[in-house]
Amino acid sequence: MIVALPPLMVAEKPPMALVLGLESSCDETAVALVDNDGNIISSHLATQEILHRPYGGVVPEIAARAHVERLEPLVRKVLNESGKNLSEIDAIAATAGPGLIGGVMVGFVTGKALSLACKKPLIAINHLEGHALTPRLADKTLSFPYLLLLISGGHCQILLVKNVGEYRRLATTIDDAGGEAFDKTAKILGLGFPGGPAVEREALNGDPMAVPLPRPLIKSKEPHFSFAGLKTAVLRAYQSGIYKRHDIAASFQQAVIDCLVNRSEKALKKIEGENIQINAFVIAGGMAANQAIRPALTDLAEAHNLPLIAPPPSLCTDNGAMIAWAGVERFRLGMIDNLESPARARWPLDPHAEKARGAGVKA
């Protein structure tokens, strides 16, 4: 079933859009200004890596406080660089979830305040929709519908993207997300934070076939993901003392790639079996920045006579441009929200999707 995310208020379709986007759902504070044609007028980001590195992961309280300190200066920086003032902006788009609720609230309340003070429309953006629509920012020829592999630190899903606000979830993780498994593997191997890039770098010098690691759910008929068992296998391989660190990293990364390809293959066959025509196979989310993942998915797409569309790495990880662009997409369709819109820790793109069998299914 295709389920639309309902707007709280519908306005007349505007001819043009210049949207300010605010992102604060995890550990990146980001602001950007994007126009109707997808031109990124200005985009700036303040990372919190140094703040969280001593803890080996993101600390929600620290993240929220950092967003408070950094968001307003970033807004001023983007406006100054663009030569625009708030009166010239058509709408304010802010992440309203899902994510770490403290950080989400900081950004969304700031968006509401700007909307109220400047009398500009507010657009509440689902962070996942920001990722889902970013490929259309990166490739202006991409049209609906397309199949999306959304891979990040908090989510691992396969979605049929039919239109703005219309999503059908075909697969999700039944436990850990792929990016979370990368972070945990980096911690096990002592590679530091953030874990994804650290594992990717370490894997460059390793043998991807050196360590026998499982491919969870590889024989399952449904295209759902599972990475908890793989993470445990990495821990055991490391504790055995038999394998070199770079070989474990390379073998882990290859196992993840094999799972992504296998699950995506099943999803592609599923929609082909339903005679659904799509225009592209698309990847997005922080893990999509991993350069080792792309070649295998390119081969898969080509085997199904589809192009693989992947944003540049700078648009894969959390950024303000993706939120501003999602705001542009919604604003052009008249999808406007009001000041009573809530911030949400969880906000599935397809709230009516059947729950996958397994514990801890993520939105």
Swiss-Prot record:
A matching Pfam family: TsaD
GO molecular function per UniProt: iron ion binding; N(6)-L-threonylcarbamoyladenine synthase activity
EC number, as in UniProt: 2.3.1.234
EC class (word): transferase
Cofactor note: Binds 1 Fe(2+) ion per subunit.
UniProt keyword terms in alphabetical order: Acyltransferase, Cytoplasm, Iron, Metal-binding, Transferase, tRNA processing
Family classification: Belongs to the KAE1 / TsaD family.
Name under which the protein is recorded: tRNA N6-adenosine threonylcarbamoyltransferase
Source organism: Zymomonas mobilis subsp. mobilis (strain ATCC 31821 / ZM4 / CP4)
